[in-house]
């Protein structure tokens, strides 16, 4: 398919700079696609450019689509293929989230606040607002339990032994909340910033609180928790949002 790049470029009235851009984009495209075009390979290419700037992505999509149409016109391709922005969405909906190795989350770090936030989500499946609402009085490290009081009700969650040292470190000098300044809880942005800084420091940039919570869900399911049990642990009104994780 690479052999058709130059004839394609020659068929268009392009400036020297545009020719270079087309050639560069199409060489990348052909390198990834190979000699046989199919939907799976096109989805792979689509995903490979997903994180580029909007202008760069549009340029590459346009160039690739023009080339695909040219290949169809000269009968190199029996079918007409076209890349669209929805292709990546279709693929991500089908992808099953995978469990990541979280050992690095427990290693020593200067970003101790962000670390504890991430561990509370990973270990207990808490939301950021639930983490922010943890009160010192409701943490019993001797019996390794957290009593979580929210608008949805009260949940008593077990604390793993590995989590205790991290909590002990942060409880020193706290008056009301686990995360506070002189008895006043930190803002939502504070939690976001500290979590973002920590996950970036360990090479997991882009790992959000939602994705960390998803890791808890996947591990609990793997451990044999039923959808109803997991729904209760998370304090959900209905297990409906968990159904996608339990589909065979």
Swiss-Prot record:
Name where it mostly resides: cytoplasm
Q: Where found?
A: Cytoplasm
Gene Ontology CC, one term: cytoplasm
One short Pfam family name for this protein? Phage_integrase
- Which positions fall inside the Core-binding (CB) domain? 1-72
- GO MF term list: DNA binding; tyrosine-based site-specific recombinase activity
CDD domains linked to this entry: INT_StrepXerD_C_like
Query: Which keywords has UniProt assigned to this entry?
Result: Cytoplasm, DNA integration, DNA recombination, DNA-binding
Metal-binding is among the record's keywords: no
User: Which InterPro entries does the UniProt entry name for this protein?
Assistant: CB, DNA_brk_join_enz, Integrase-like_cat_sf, Integrase_catalytic, Integrase_recombinase_N, Tyrosine_recombinase_XerD-like
Every copy of the Tyr recombinase domain together lies at 85-248
Would the keyword DNA-binding be found if you checked this record's keyword annotation?
Answer: yes
Provide the active-site residues from the annotation: 149, 213, 245
**One of the GO biological process terms:** DNA transposition
| Residues in coiled coil | none
Q: What exactly does this protein do?
A: Putative tyrosine recombinase. Not involved in the cutting and rejoining of the recombining DNA molecules on dif(SL) site.
Q: Which family does it belong to?
A: Belongs to the 'phage' integrase family. XerD-like subfamily.
| Annotated protein name in UniProt | Tyrosine recombinase XerD-like
Question: What organism is the protein native to?
Answer: Streptococcus pyogenes serotype M1
């Amino acid at each position: 398919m690479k052999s058709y790049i130059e004839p394609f470029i020659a068929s268009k009235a392009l400036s020297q700079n545009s020719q270079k851009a087309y050639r560069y984009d199409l060489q990348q495209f052909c390198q990834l696609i190979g000699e046989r075009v199919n939907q799976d390979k096109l989805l792979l290419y689509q995903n490979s450019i997903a994180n580029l700037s909007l202008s760069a992505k549009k340029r590459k999509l346009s160039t690739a689509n023009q080339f695909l149409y040219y290949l169809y016109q000269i009968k190199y391709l029996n079918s007409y293929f076209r890349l669209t922005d929805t292709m990546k969405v279709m693929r991500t909906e089908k992808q099953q989230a995978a469990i990541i190795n979280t050992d690095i989350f427990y290693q020593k770090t200067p970003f101790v606040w962000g670390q504890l936030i991430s561990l509370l989500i990973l270990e207990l499946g808490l939301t950021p607002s639930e983490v922010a609402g943890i009160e010192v009085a409701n943490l019993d490290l001797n019996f390794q339990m957290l009593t979580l009081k929210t608008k949805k009700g009260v949940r008593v969650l077990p604390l793993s032994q590995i989590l205790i040292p991290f909590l002990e470190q942060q409880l020193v000098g706290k008056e009301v909340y686990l995360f506070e300044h002189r008895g006043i809880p930190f803002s939502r942005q504070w939690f976001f910033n500290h979590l973002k800084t920590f996950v970036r420091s360990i090479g997991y940039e882009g790992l959000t609180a939602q994705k960390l919570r998803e890791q808890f869900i996947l591990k609990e399911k793997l451990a044999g928790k039923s959808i109803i049990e997991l729904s209760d642990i998370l304090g959900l009104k209905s297990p409906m949002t968990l159904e996608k994780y339990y589909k065979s």
